[in-house]
Structure formats: C-alpha cells, structure tokens
Amino acid sequence: MAHKKAGGSTRNGRDSNPKYLGVKRYGGEFVKAGTIIIRQRGTKTHPGVNVGCGKDHTLFALKDGTVKFHTGGALNRKFVSIEE
C-alpha cells in the first residue's frame, strides 16, 4: 500500500509588497498645495502650519511654500510646516 502522508502547512510562505513609506519632500524644498510630504504609519511627525493629515497619517501641503521641519510643543514632538 503506497501512501503519501499530507504535507504540513508552512508558516513562511508569504512576502508582502513594499509600502514606500518615508519623507518625500525634504526641508527647504518648494512644494505646491496637495504635494505629499511624508508617508508614515501613525503620527511619527505631526502636521504643523499649512500641513494636512490624511486618514493613513500621510502629511501633505495645504498651500504653496517651503517645507520646514522643527520640534516643539509640550512633548517636544516633531512637526512639519509650510512657510509661504
């Protein structure tokens, strides 16, 4: 009786696609309204003046201007702002 036992399932058989997170426009760069500045998971960097935050925590420019990174607030958080 030639039988083959069922193979066990593997735990490693997957490889997720890259998410392309990170800073897209750096400090000092001129951006137009709607330009994505940072793609991130959670608010590692918070939106400052003239910067909006999407539902996936993407930070984007609300007005044309120059990107500026800075820290501040009571908890010394990282912020990104747009200077007109």
Curated annotation (Swiss-Prot):
Location of region: Disordered: 1-20
Single GO biological process annotation from the record: translation
Keywords: Ribonucleoprotein, Ribosomal protein
Keyword DNA repair: no
A single MF term (Gene Ontology): structural constituent of ribosome
Cellular component GO terms held in the UniProt record: cytosolic large ribosomal subunit
Keyword Ribonucleoprotein assigned: yes
Alphabetized PROSITE patterns for the sequence: RIBOSOMAL_L27
Gene3D superfamilies named among the record's database cross-references: 2.40.50.100
PANTHER family xrefs: LARGE RIBOSOMAL SUBUNIT PROTEIN BL27M (PTHR15893:SF0), RIBOSOMAL PROTEIN L27 (PTHR15893)
Family the UniProt entry places it in: Belongs to the bacterial ribosomal protein bL27 family.
The protein, known as: Large ribosomal subunit protein bL27
Organism: Francisella tularensis subsp. tularensis (strain SCHU S4 / Schu 4)
